[in-house]
A protein has these predicted regions:
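Active-site loop/oxyanion-hole signature of alpha/beta-hydrolase fold enzymes
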Residues: 15-22, 27-65, 80-81, 229
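The conserved beta1-alpha1 loop
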Residues: 7-9, 185
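Active-site glycine-rich loops that stabilize anionic/oxyanionic intermediates
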Residues: 9-12, 68
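Catalytic histidine neighborhood in serine/cysteine hydrolases
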Residues: 194, 198-217
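Catalytic histidine-centered segment of alpha/beta-hydrolase-like enzymes
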Residues: 215-228
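Conserved hydrolase catalytic core segment
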Residues: 61-99
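Conserved alpha/beta-hydrolase catalytic His-Asp/Glu region
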Residues: 98-104, 116-176
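Short beta-strand/loop motif that positions the catalytic acidic residue
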Residues: 177, 183-185, 189
Length: 238
């Protein structure tokens, strides 16, 4: 049985994968959680923690799929520990570093969190993760998202945010890797803008690209079936 490791993004936890993981029962699906961690000051440190975690649960080979910040961890992991990977994927994520404008925006967001706490940040950012039409049609899902993740500890949310801010560009890794790479994009994603990132899918030797026309940044919730089918198809290539 193949092992699939799903890495959650920033401002959520591993429960975000529950709707999707139930549709992937033919695989061993692992969903590590680092949403409350405060010890890791860089994306590379999260990747080192993940390596130790995988070894501790007996994983020798896996496919790693990272959502948003989880994608940044995935790339750092692929750079440091390639022998463990049969394949990897970026799920609403990017290999680019932040440009200067984005870094300035993040500094303001960081100051907001330091002054007002993580709950205020989640109330502001959570709804923007979903496509507008989905949010309008599913207000309870968005409301539950905000209520659930407003409980995350502020210091952990800030720690993760700082690591995201300081991550390097890893586009070279996509060009150099020999394992299959999956890209899942949301056409309505306001955070990982489709038009700016679709070109990344041309870099790997073996790439599979999925475009979710109606999804924003939360395809595992907005279009669960399409995501599950795409992942199953991809795992057949690894």
């Amino acid at each position: 049985m193949k092992t699939l490791v799903l890495l959650h993004g920033h401002g959520v936890d591993s429960k975000i994968w529950e709707p999707l993981s139930t549709k992937l029962s033919d695989y061993q699906v692992l969903t590590p959680d680092y949403s409350a961690e405060v010890a890791y000051q860089s994306i590379e440190a999260y990747a080192d923690w993940l390596y130790q975690w995988l070894i501790s649960v007996g994983v020798e080979k896996c496919t790693l799929l990272g959502h948003s910040m989880g994608g940044y961890i995935t790339l750092a992991f692929a750079e440091k520990y390639p022998d463990l990977l049969e394949g990897f994927g970026l799920f609403h994520s990017t290999a680019y570093a932040d440009d200067e404008a984005k870094k300035e925006q993040r500094k303001k967001t960081l100051a907001f969190m330091e002054n007002h706490g993580a709950a205020a940040f989640i109330r502001q950012s959570g709804p923007n993760m979903y496509a507008e039409e989905f949010a309008e049609q599913n207000p309870e899902i968005v409301k539950n998202h905000v209520e659930q993740y407003s409980q995350l500890p502020t210091d952990a949310v800030i720690t993760g945010f700082r690591a995201i801010m300081n991550r390097p560009d890893r586009t070279h890794l996509l060009s150099e890797t020999s394992v299959p790479v999956l890209f899942i994009f949301g056409k309505q994603d306001k955070l990982i803008v489709f038009e700016k990132n679709i070109g990344l899918s041309e870099l790997p030797q073996k790439a599979s690209t999925v475009i979710l026309a109606q999804a924003g940044h939360m395809g595992m919730i907005e279009d669960t079936d399409a995501c599950a089918d795409s992942i199953k198809t991809f795992l057949q290539t690894t």
